[in-house]
Amino acid sequence: MRHGHQPVSDFPPREAGDDECPGDKPNFFEKAFPCLYPYGRGGLESGRPVPLDFPEHVRWSLQYFDRRFRKHETFPFITFGISQRRQALNSARIQMKRSTFEREAHTVAAITAEKLDRAKEEEESGLPISDEAVRALKRHVYATAARVSGTDQARYRLRSQIWSTSTVLGPPSLWITINPSDLHDPIAQIFAGEEIDMDRFEATLGPDKTRRAKNIADDPYAAAKFFHFMITTILETLFQVKVTPSQVKSGMGVFGRVATYFGTVESQGRGTLHLHILVWLQHVPSPEEITALLKTEAFRNRVLAYIQANFRAYVPGLESAESIALLPHNNEISYSRPPNPKCEDYNGEIQRSELELARMEQVHVCKPRRCLVYDRHNQLVCKRRAPFQVANEAFVTDTGMCGPKRLYGYINSWVPSILVNARCNNDGKFLTSGADTKNITFYVTSYAAKKQGKNYNVSAVMADGYAYHLEHPKPEYIDSIRDQQRLLLFRLVHSINREQELAGPMVMSYLMGWGDVFRSHTYSPIYWGSFTNALYVAFPELSRRTQ
């Protein structure tokens, strides 16, 4: 084995000629992963009588029976990187055809290394970019990246879908966060290959906590599959929403009848996936009607009963730090099954299980590098805003402020049905007032659909990418400004993507087509420019009036 001197092409192979055998071309995957292809055959996009496209072959590989592809340290990340490069190239080609690019092509052509260096310094100083050409280039780079899965700009596009849902159905009714416990849940261990009898489950049998953690760390595919299985199961059983390719079926769930939902998937520092979801309920009064109804005691009592049934931050035993310390401490409580509804003392089992789970999953402990950050006054504060509001009883005011009973300020609220049945950390809030609804909707559109954490200067990365672009020109593109700028956009997007830090379970979600969003309905983009152009053609006086 020796290193080659030519770069490996990661674009689809060209079709073989009439006198060329498809299997004669060398295959990068067969040579780079001899442990995955021990016979030197069967690599991705290798010659075969029936062509198999790249994404489908990757999905097949990740589901291979011996799990060698999904447990490989680099195979998923390399295939995802190749997929991103191909999407970026197609996206750059689409961007070239936009009318906005036609208008700004010569402005972008005026970019120089000095302008990008100046933009880098401005970004480091926290100042806005002053050069118009650099701003135009960034707009096109971000627009190109928005069509590439896993990028920050692709997540930004989710915001318009959330706002369009609110435009059609009004403000959301519920805000819920679900954080399935992949380290200890027995279902995740089954996906990782453990033999566990769920019908005759015994917590003392099966893998111990060290082995369970190793199973999930070694198999990000199992972690991702478990997460999507759990969220789908919660939506279909507890929420009673069944989504098919042709329709959305909604029954009576724990929250009532759901009109629609929209949730975004995010990964934590150690790679665990969790969901932020907004829920719109059916037959909800308009914001104006709610404002008027909240003035009546009868309506406030109904809202109060709804909150007491579905959102809690207290059960007997969680009065203070001292009372919590007296409760049993079971770190492996998630390695269990929910109470059996057929047991004689089901209600008692539910209450005991809820207390044990709330003790382990819902008590917030502030720690540096987890939630404690420095504010602008150089003071350590909890970014989760603990301690939370304390209330002796659940409350609803005539202004719409509401909350559950909470006696200890470091208890996160929870949804009882999710806590007991999914046996994981969760949070929930019922939205009544306009202020709460606007704040939460803004949070989920700006935070839950936020960009991934980064520790790099975008302008600096673009400057390096531009320098590479100048050093490696394509002779065949010299006479075409469109081709030159398409190549520049592709290279800049690829330079930024190289700086991404994506967790293994999130990469598996993209490769398997599961994505990073749960939504009950589909969305179609509306290009408003087409409507305005049609209006100007039909009513020329509108154009003159605008001028």
Regions found by a protein language model. Give the residues of each.
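Intrinsic low-complexity, intrinsically disordered terminal tails and linker regions enriched
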Residues: 1-275, 279-547
